[in-house]
A protein has these predicted regions:
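A contiguous strand-loop segment
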Residues: 1-38, 52, 64-66
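C-terminus-biased signal that marks the final domain/tail of proteins
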Residues: 45-191
Length: 191
């Protein structure tokens, strides 16, 4: 699994000791409400005892807003999208990806979505398919450095981002700076 995130928003990104990895991005919808904050929902999903339980945690009612989750197990990937009131969960499949804009048509009535972001996601998925881990790591870092891939503040300053590659078989996570930064990949093994 590869995930790209901004430093400081890492509550639900990582490798779980129960054998799954998860990436998450906030989504924007018009049905936001008072409820459990998205960061707490994503953290609860990452701390679940299984990928199935992570899906349940991600889709619990009483959410204040939504996220796009990518939950990866050794057998496949599920994409889970939520708004405050709506959720959509894909069947397990070999590949999955998400951006901070809704992909599922189920959210058309509430989404504040941008087609350009979804198009970049589809291009990234096509680019990353069928490559070695090393090539995948370099391509992921390159994608993060691509114009328009990393979100920017209104004054157009660069947001610090990182790339994470989770290897479920080895029980490890490798991470490196993205967003124009160069640096070594650092590997962390689960105990």
């Amino acid at each position: 699994m590869i995930t790209v995130s901004c430093i400081g928003f890492l509550t639900g990104v990582g490798l779980n000791g129960s054998g799954f990895a998860m990436g998450v991005q906030s989504t924007s919808a018009r049905d936001a409400r008072v409820g459990v904050p998205r960061a707490m929902v994503s953290r609860s999903a990452l701390c679940a005892l299984s990928a199935t339980e992570a899906v349940r945690e991600a889709t619990r009612h009483h959410r204040s807003g939504g996220n796009g989750f990518v939950i990866v197990t050794p057998t496949g990937v599920q994409v889970v999208e939520t708004s405050a009131a709506i959720d959509d969960v894909t069947e397990e499949r070999p590949w999955g990806a998400h951006t901070n804009h809704y992909i599922s048509n189920k959210f058309q009535t509430v989404a504040n979505s941008a087609a350009e972001s979804v198009q970049r996601l589809e291009e990234a998925v096509a680019t990353l398919g069928g490559v070695s881990d090393r090539e995948l790591m370099e391509r992921a870092r390159f994608l993060v450095q691509s114009p328009g891939f990393v979100p920017r503040s209104p004054d157009r300053s660069v947001v610090t981002a990182f790339v994470m590659l989770a290897d479920l078989g080895a029980g490890s996570v490798q991470t490196a700076p993205g967003g124009g930064e160069r640096g070594p990949w650092v590997r962390v093994n689960l105990p």
